[in-house]
Each structure stands twice: as C-alpha cells, then as structure tokens.
C-alpha cells in the first residue's frame, strides 16, 4: 500500500514535468515508443513472469530447494535467449514497425536503438518473478519505488536538455536502471547449486510454457489493444 502511494505521487510529479518539457506531441511519441516496446516484451517474455512465480512458489512451498534452483536456472537462461531473439527481430522489423505505427520510416532508427529495451526488460522481469515466487514482498516494493524514482530522475534531465531527442535515451537509461535495481535484490537470494541436464531443463521449460503462453496471450491482447 505504501509503495503504491509513493509510486502514484512520483508518477504525478513526473507526468507534470514531462507534459511541460515535451508538450502533447512529445508525450504522445514517448507513449507510442513505450507501448511498442511493451508489446514486443510481452511476447518475448513467453509468460514466464506469471508461470515462473507460480512454479517457484509451488516448489518453495514444498521446501524443494533443488527444484527451486532448477526453475530459477531455467528462467534465467530462457529470458536471456528470448530477449536476444526479441531484440534481433525488433531490429529486423524496425522499418515495418515504424511504417505501421507512424506511417513513415522516420522512426526506424529510434526503434533500432530502443530494441535493447526488449532484452533489458526480459531480464528484469525474470529477476522480479523469482523474487515474487520466493515471496520477497519487501524487496518487490523497494524495486517498485526505486523504479519510479529512477525513471523520474533520469527522464526529467533528458527532456530538459534535449527535448524530444531525449525520449530514446531516457527510455533506455530507465530500463538499465530498472534492471540494475532488480538484479541487486535478486543477487541477495540464496539459491543452491545444482546440475541442470538438458532433459530436466526441457521438462521445467515445458511446465513453465504450458501455463505461461496462455497468460502471455491474454497480456498481449491487453497491451496490443493500447498499441492499436
């Protein structure tokens, strides 16, 4: 509750500054870039942010530390691969995305630069879902607050000095800050060392995807509706 209030307060302050510094056109452009990256990240996350929490919480509730370790390893390796693939696909399709969204190729280069956010977001979501699965509620709240603070402290100077040209750097730097924060807290988690043969990895990944992909589909429809 407290973290939600802080986030809302900081969000109101950021929104006010952004509106003044960027104007309606700049705010609209920032929102479109954000929505594009969110839509792609939703697909490339494969729903692991939902299924990962469920599987880790289940294994942790059974005090099965070895399975928790296997699931965590599977999630971490998968989000790296899917994030890299998503980034590459975004770069390849950047021209089409720009044309479809803005009816022009002018935004192709910014979308190429922003494609790294897909990877950064994937990794950050993976770390956060591990914390959620292990019920690190206090850490999640701190990550949320730091995310709002960092986003504000990064975006306002970018917009003040560069105007609309600061949108792309601010989004990338905010994603880096969010990843750094989540990684800082995720590193504190004690996970036992365990081998992860390919057979077991495939089994765990199959379990994660069987629940995650339908969740991803639902989330994609919600995100894509805002994009369209």
Positions of PLM-derived features:
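Signature of the first transmembrane helix
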Residues: 1-54, 87-91, 117, 148-152, ...
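Alpha-helical transmembrane segments of multi-pass membrane transporters/permeases
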Residues: 1-6, 111-117, 130-156, 168, ...
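Helix-loop junctions and terminal segments of transmembrane helices
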Residues: 16, 46-62, 133, 191-194
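Helix-capping/transition residues at the boundaries of transmembrane alpha-helices
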Residues: 19, 98, 132, 158-159
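Membrane-interface helix-capping segments at transmembrane helix termini in multi-pass transporters
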Residues: 24-30, 62-74, 84-115, 160-169
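Short alpha-helical transmembrane interface motifs in multi-pass membrane proteins
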Residues: 36-41, 77-81, 108-113, 135-139, ...
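Alpha-helical transmembrane segments of multi-pass membrane proteins
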Residues: 88, 92, 103-127, 141-145, ...
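Interhelical loop/hinge segments that connect adjacent transmembrane helices in multipass membrane
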Residues: 182-227
């Amino acid at each position: 509750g407290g973290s939600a209030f802080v986030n809302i307060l900081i969000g109101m302050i950021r929104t006010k500054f952004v509106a003044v510094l960027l104007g309606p056109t700049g705010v609209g452009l920032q929102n479109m870039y954000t929505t594009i990256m969110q839509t792609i990240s939703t697909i490339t996350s494969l729903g692991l942010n939902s299924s990962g929490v469920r599987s880790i919480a289940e294994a942790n509730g059974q005090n099965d530390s070895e399975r928790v370790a296997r699931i965590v390893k599977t999630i971490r390796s998968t989000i790296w691969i899917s994030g890299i693939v998503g980034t590459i696909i975004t770069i390849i399709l950047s021209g089409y995305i720009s044309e479809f969204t803005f009816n022009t190729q002018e935004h192709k280069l910014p979308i190429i630069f922003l494609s790294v956010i897909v990877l950064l977001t994937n990794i950050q979501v993976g770390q956060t879902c591990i914390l959620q699965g292990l019920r690190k509620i206090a850490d999640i709240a701190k990550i949320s607050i730091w995310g709002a603070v960092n986003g504000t402290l990064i975006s306002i100077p970018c917009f003040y000095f560069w105007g609309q040209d600061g949108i792309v750097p601010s989004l990338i730097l905010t994603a880096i800050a969010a990843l750094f924060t989540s990684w800082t807290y995720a590193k504190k988690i004690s996970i036992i060392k365990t081998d992860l043969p390919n057979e077991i990895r495939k089994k765990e990944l199959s379990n994660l995807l069987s629940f995650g992909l339908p969740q991803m589909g639902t989330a994609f429809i919600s995100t894509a509706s805002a994009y369209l």
